[in-house]
UniProtKB/Swiss-Prot annotation:
SUPFAM superfamilies: Phospholipase A2, PLA2. InterPro entries: PLipase_A2, PLipase_A2_Asp_AS, PLipase_A2_dom, PLipase_A2_dom_sf. It comes from Xenopus laevis. GO terms for cellular component: extracellular region. The keyword rRNA processing does not apply. One of its GO terms (biological process) is phosphatidylcholine metabolic process. This is Phospholipase A2 homolog otoconin-22. Its main location: secreted. Keywords: Disulfide bond, Glycoprotein, Secreted. Monomer.
Length: 127
């Protein structure tokens, strides 16, 4: 669920939550067009692709719950899933949260609410 993804982000980045990434660049949040603006935006593009694959399998990223734990160095990992959808959605969120952690130095306040500036145009990269 988005609430669980928010927890993952808070654990991995320490200072940020889902709100900091919900309208960042051209691919974080509801907007999915144009080229990603930086490595964090690429994290979101990858998560979008992952969610699309899960949705094509009948899974719902908004309602699917899952369990995860925190490893050393603030890395999150999914726990053993009870079904395919739980596994797929958790892994999508796990990869994105760990990607945010890895690319946190790239976070640029300029790219918050960026899509509202009309800068995200053109085709999006393939998955």
């Amino acid at each position: 669920t988005p609430a669980q993804f928010d927890e993952m982000i808070k654990v991995t980045t320490i200072i940020y939550g889902l709100a900091n990434f919900s309208d960042y660049g051209c691919h974080c949040g509801l907007n999915n067009q144009g080229m990603p603006v930086d490595d964090i935006d690429w994290c979101c593009h990858s998560q979008d692709c992952c969610y699309n694959k899960a949705e094509m399998s009948g899974c719902n990223p908004v309602t699917q719950t899952y369990r995860f734990y925190v490893e050393e160095q603030k890395k999150v990992e999914c726990m053993k899933a009870s079904n395919r959808c739980e596994k797929m959605i958790c892994e999508c969120d796990e990869k994105a949260a760990n990607c945010f952690r890895k690319e946190l130095e790239d976070y640029n306040i300029y790219f918050r609410n960026f899509s509202s500036l009309g800068a995200c145009r053109g085709p999006r990269p393939f998955c």
